[in-house]
């Protein structure tokens, strides 16, 4: 079953009807990210932590939030405590933030699962005359 083009609403229905578990959904998300590795669009994979969180969500059977158990990829400019955040910059290539950005905190407190951070490419800064 491919989840690649499913909406959050469709995934939520699948979770509610127990067609798929959060752990299976998170695993499928990591498989898709691995399949797209050649595109070089993901900076940091959060596989172990995200699989563990999905197992906890499955055990707790939390469906109070629409995002509960839904895997998300976040842009590589939002800090997540303990997850390498580079902003696609060489100077930040090994930066592990000691805090989590408010936006990420709100998503995670709603039950979403951060699976990967994807590239943040800036526009060229060369001046065009």
Which positions does each model-derived feature cover?
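Flexible N-terminal pre-Rossmann segment of NAD(P)-dependent oxidoreductases
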Residues: 3-4, 60-70
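An N-terminal boundary/leader segment
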Residues: 1-45, 51
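Conserved amphipathic alpha-helix within the SDR
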Residues: 56-58, 91
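Enzymes and membrane/adaptor proteins characterized by extended Gly/Ser/Thr/Asp/Glu-rich
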Residues: 66-106, 110
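Conserved small/polar residues in nucleotide/adenosyl-binding loops
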Residues: 118-125
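Long amphipathic alpha-helix in the N-terminal Rossmann-like dinucleotide-binding domain
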Residues: 48-55, 111-112
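General beta-strand structural signal in soluble alpha/beta enzymes
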Residues: 74, 114-117
């Amino acid at each position: 079953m491919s989840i690649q083009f499913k909406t959050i609403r469709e995934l939520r229905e699948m979770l509610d009807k127990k067609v798929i578990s959060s752990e299976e959904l998170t695993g499928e998300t990591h498989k898709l990210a691995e399949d797209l590795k050649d595109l070089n669009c993901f900076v940091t994979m959060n596989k172990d932590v995200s699989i563990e969180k999905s197992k906890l969500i499955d055990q707790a059977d939390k469906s109070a939030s629409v995002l509960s158990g839904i895997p998300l990829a976040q842009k590589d400019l939002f800090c997540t405590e303990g997850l390498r955040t580079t902003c696609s910059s060489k100077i930040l290539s090994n930066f592990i933030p000691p805090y989590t950005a408010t936006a990420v905190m709100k998503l995670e407190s709603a039950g979403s699962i951060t699976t990967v951070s994807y590239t943040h490419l800036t526009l060229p800064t060369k001046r065009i005359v």
